[in-house]
Swiss-Prot record:
It catalyses: N(6)-carboxybiotinyl-L-lysyl-[protein] + acetyl-CoA = N(6)-biotinyl-L-lysyl-[protein] + malonyl-CoA. This is Acetyl-coenzyme A carboxylase carboxyl transferase subunit alpha. It comes from the Bacteria. Keywords: ATP-binding, Cytoplasm, Fatty acid biosynthesis, Fatty acid metabolism, Lipid biosynthesis, Lipid metabolism, Nucleotide-binding, Transferase. Belongs to the AccA family. It comes from Listeria welshimeri serovar 6b (strain ATCC 35897 / DSM 20650 / CCUG 15529 / CIP 8149 / NCTC 11857 / SLCC 5334 / V8). GO terms for cellular component: acetyl-CoA carboxylase complex.
Amino acid sequence: MANEMEFEKPILELKSKIADLKEYNETSDVDLTNEIEKLEKRLAKLEASVYSNMTAWDKFQVARHPERPTTLDYISLLFEDFMELHGDRAFGDDAAIVGGVATFNGIPVTVIGHQRGKDTKDNLHRNFGMPHPEGFRKALRLMKQADKFGRPIICFIDTKGAYPGRAAEERGQSEAIARNLYEMSDMKVPIISIVIGEGGSGGALALGVGNQIFMLENAVFSVISPEGAAAILWKDAGQAKKAAESMRITADDLFELGITDGIIPEVKGGAHRDLTAQAAEINKTITKSLHALMAFSEEQLMNQRYEKFKKIGVYEIL
């Protein structure tokens, strides 16, 4: 089956066997109902075992799944009256980042996120979700607009990282990212950031200075990809699985380290299995977070955000 992952093979093989038996059961005189029921019970146990014992590498594969829902997928289900806004008012429009104004349960908000493509043509248009400087500057323009008009900001993070090409560097890639971090830290409105897939390095951080940060259960957040880390540490990108297990990139890891504020449960097998159900889980988290943050004053929001990031990376020697 296309786009299925290595760790799911036992599940897929059993599902295929059940499907074959059901088809045979409908066309033959032999009653295989009992056998099918036994296999379905076995399948339920197998799925529970596999999906509750996923490794960091397994989750990394799910986070990169080609059919994983994107920012625009979630926007269509979570927000009303979304109006996309374009351009950074300096160089151009970057399709790797989408954003605009909308309402969330009647509350005017600004929503921004990385956008990967759905197929080869779309990925080329979206630059595989890797923003150029104009993408980050577009995001900042929308954030400043939200700050001016008192609209909460909701960011969806899903990128391998900022685009590392020559043109991007010439247009000030590092400055654009740094400027977002600087400006976001001083915004007077609630900022909620949600890692929905892959949170890669500075490209993710540029939308990640939130009052609260959440991750989907199978999302990852890291300074470098496992392949990149393996190439640096062991001179062998083939050691990516080993690197993933060492890097602490999963939602559980980031929550334990105090970097994120919560984990959003995923539907069994990953968000791509049921977009509507997954959007409903995200809706619950945004609703609860907005309710809490909108009770804060402007000064409290800025202080809370400052204190949150001030604590990250603090350690003590035992």
